[in-house]
Amino acid sequence: MMGKLIWLMGPSGSGKDSLLAELRLREQTQLLVAHRYITRDASAGSENHIALSEQEFFTRAGQNLLALSWHANGLYYGVGVEIDLWLHAGFDVLVNGSRAHLPQARARYQSALLPICLQVSPEILRQRLENRGRENASEINARLARAARYTPQDCHTLNNDGSLRQSVDTLLTLIHQKEKHHACL
């Protein structure tokens, strides 16, 4: 049976990287977290990713080695075709996805896709963005405005205002509920 592709989305500062890092500490035999290929230095940001030059990225894309790819915030992002092998082997695969590119993921994976939108309250989102110190005040305000107006339709919502442990527990419960439903189809 084919696994589910869990497309985790959320605004910058919602805690996606922290959630994925915490999830990796849990023993999950049927859930794999996919790494992303990004045209960003390996030491930039907190995400565990594979850094590529733009040339390397375009070469991989041109050879159909990326299952999904997109451009956002001046960078190119991609997920390798290895996720298709994992899915066909029956593993669930979690991807740090893009809200704007959910339609692309939906078109490719259709009923195997489980879209989850990570949300936090505006106050907590502002605090997290200020604490990480990457954006100035106007950039933070722009990110808050985008977060408020851009929530994808037809996706499961996961609130990340609480503890990471609580959010990971809720995420795993949601994934396992969908696995049971998927197995009955």
Swiss-Prot record:
Keyword annotations of the record: ATP-binding, Nucleotide-binding, Transferase
Sections of the chain in a coiled coil: none
Reaction(s) catalysed (UniProt annotation): alpha-D-ribose 1,5-bisphosphate + ATP = 5-phospho-alpha-D-ribose 1-diphosphate + ADP
Domain of life: Bacteria
A molecular-function term among this protein's GO annotations: ATP binding
EC nos: 2.7.4.23
GO BP: any one term: 5-phosphoribose 1-diphosphate biosynthetic process
Pathway: Metabolic intermediate biosynthesis; 5-phospho-alpha-D-ribose 1-diphosphate biosynthesis; 5-phospho-alpha-D-ribose 1-diphosphate from D-ribose 5-phosphate (route II): step 3/3
Record-listed ATP binding positions: 10-17
Function: Catalyzes the phosphorylation of ribose 1,5-bisphosphate to 5-phospho-D-ribosyl alpha-1-diphosphate (PRPP).
NCBIfam families: phosphon_PhnN (TIGR02322), PRK10078.1 (NF007485)
UniProt family annotation: Belongs to the ribose 1,5-bisphosphokinase family.
Full protein name: Ribose 1,5-bisphosphate phosphokinase PhnN
